[in-house]
């Protein structure tokens, strides 16, 4: 069991005791707590994208920034054209990104099966959040007109279908890996336990809490450790303090920009609710970030 999964279980145990003590946690408290930890850990894990790939000269750096900003602009155009298409694209990219971040070390030597596995594994996680908390998803969406309208265009039964389909396919793929690629059974069992813990937390906890636990502890923290080890490998004098100092300015700028846009939404300067504009902002950043992390993880798997 990885140290991150152990941390996850410990935090889940603490939160379950908090629920028993107070019977429930208000949605306002959940939102504030989730937002705080996402800003503390989630945003920093993507703040150094521009430093993770080799950019030796001005031309390569310029190409990187044009590509990065171009993907953001393209995604914004998609959301402006259709919120449904933007949401579907966001779920697909997030699913692939989560799966790739977890399973990149499998190194299956078959790109098609590898990419398909990343997508299915990530989808099994994403739809577990929705499947076990569908009533809360509807409640949160109904709190704002634009999110209510967005969800009204989706057949909620589809979440159940995608939940079962993605999980069944993932299990079949794991069995196939043992047979075809000779992946050790104990490694597959470890991944199955990992998924079981995610499903259990999604079943036990509200949507915001189970997602935040996963995103912070099982996704962002491992990524931060990989990034730190990367910089440490390049410079053996690189310290944790250096890493924090390196992340801090980019993270603070990102947080301030997000707060500013949220303020504009709250004061109706931007004609989107805070939840919807938050989803859009996370979506447009996730697209280029997933490309960078994919390339970065490829270098780690070599």
Regions found by a protein language model. Name each.
Residues 1-11, 58-62, 244:
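N-terminal membrane topogenic signal
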């Amino acid at each position: 069991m990885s140290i991150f999964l152990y941390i996850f279980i410990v935090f889940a145990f603490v939160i379950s005791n908090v629920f028993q003590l107070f019977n429930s946690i208000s949605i306002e408290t959940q939102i504030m707590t989730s937002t705080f930890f996402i800003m503390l850990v989630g945003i920093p894990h993507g703040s150094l994208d521009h430093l993770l790939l080799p950019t030796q000269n001005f031309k390569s750096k310029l190409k990187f920034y044009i590509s990065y900003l171009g993907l953001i602009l393209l995604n914004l155009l998609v959301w402006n054209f259709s919120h449904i298409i933007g949401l579907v694209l966001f779920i697909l990219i997030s699913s692939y990104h989560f799966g790739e971040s977890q399973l990149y070390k499998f190194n299956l030597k078959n790109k098609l099966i590898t990419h398909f596995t990343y997508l299915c594994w990530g989808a099994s996680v994403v739809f577990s959040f929705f499947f076990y908390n569908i009533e809360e998803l509807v409640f949160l969406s109904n709190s704002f007109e634009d999110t209510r309208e967005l969800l009204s265009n989706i057949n909620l039964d589809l979440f159940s279908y995608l939940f079962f389909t993605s999980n069944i396919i993932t299990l079949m793929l794991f069995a196939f890996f043992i047979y075809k690629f000779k992946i050790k059974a104990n490694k597959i069992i470890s991944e199955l336990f990992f998924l079981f813990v995610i499903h259990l937390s999604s079943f036990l906890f509200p949507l915001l809490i189970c997602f935040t636990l996963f995103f912070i502890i099982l996704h962002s923290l491992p990524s931060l450790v990989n990034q730190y080890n990367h910089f440490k490998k390049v410079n053996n004098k690189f310290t944790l303090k250096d890493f924090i100092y390196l992340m801090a300015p980019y993270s603070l700028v990102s947080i301030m920009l997000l707060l500013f846009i949220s303020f504009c939404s709250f004061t109706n300067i931007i004609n989107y609710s805070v939840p919807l504009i938050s989803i859009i902002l996370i979506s447009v950043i996730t697209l280029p970030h997933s490309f960078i992390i994919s390339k970065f993880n490829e270098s780690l798997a070599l």
